[in-house]
Amino acid sequence: MDCIADLPGVMEVVMVHIVGTNKPASLRSDMVSSARTRIESEATLLNNLGIPSVRTEVMVHESPAAGIDDAANRNNSDIIVMGARGKSIIKGLRLGSVTQKVLHESKKNLLIMRGPIIETLSGEKFQKYCPLIFSRVLVPVDLTTESWTAVEQLAKIPDVQEIIAAFVISRGESEQEIERLKQQAGDELEKKCRQVPTKGAEIRWRILEGDLVTRINDYAQETDVSLVCTVPTEKGFFAEMLHGSFSCELARQATKPVLVIRRP
């Protein structure tokens, strides 16, 4: 809750709890009542932390992911914020099924916070991932216009201090071919970075080599970015995978918060 209150620009929060229809009918009433008591207590906490408007919804729905998306659309929300909450044996490695479904099916922007990180944050680290979550953002791009949507949207946010546009070369038949790709990509990336107007953010680019998802997440860790941002698209290197699978894999493996921006 503290982290939501410290995200920049938050004016209204709608807290949603879904009770699945797979729960025994005899228990649902008590589950709804218990959830409502808990969520209203958390709403009071957010109010006390400075959020101007906090509303709560507890509903019974056959699909938690669809229920969350319905609530977001009904309230005209700009973004859905969720935890990764996977149940992998290795904690934090996998997206929870609800988060994964929202990622695939919703048209809303989605911010996925890594539960194991947020739960242990304190002091300087807490400050990085909450009020300064947009301070240093890594964006995987290719040379298509569609993949630069995230860079253009982030550049409009005053809180963003640095944007790193990362281009990954995942294959090459020879060293000469790789060098040619690097030169071509470098020229295009430099040109595109210069063309994006910002609210003060510095935009720089990097060329990486290796598996797309693995290299992006490794570089995010190496450079200690505050956020990784992506736009699901069917063009460019994303076309080589099932639509949406790149964003899903990126979010699944990430140790950093992941922001998924939907195209208009």
Pin down the residues of each PLM region.
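Small/aliphatic-rich secondary-structure junction motif
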Residues: 1-29, 131-179, 194-201, 253
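General small-molecule cofactor/ligand-binding pocket signal
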Residues: 14-16, 55-59, 111, 164-166, ...
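Short, well-ordered secondary-structure micro-motifs
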Residues: 26-27, 93, 122-123, 150-151, ...
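Short, surface-exposed alpha-helical segments at coil->helix boundaries
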Residues: 29-40, 179-190
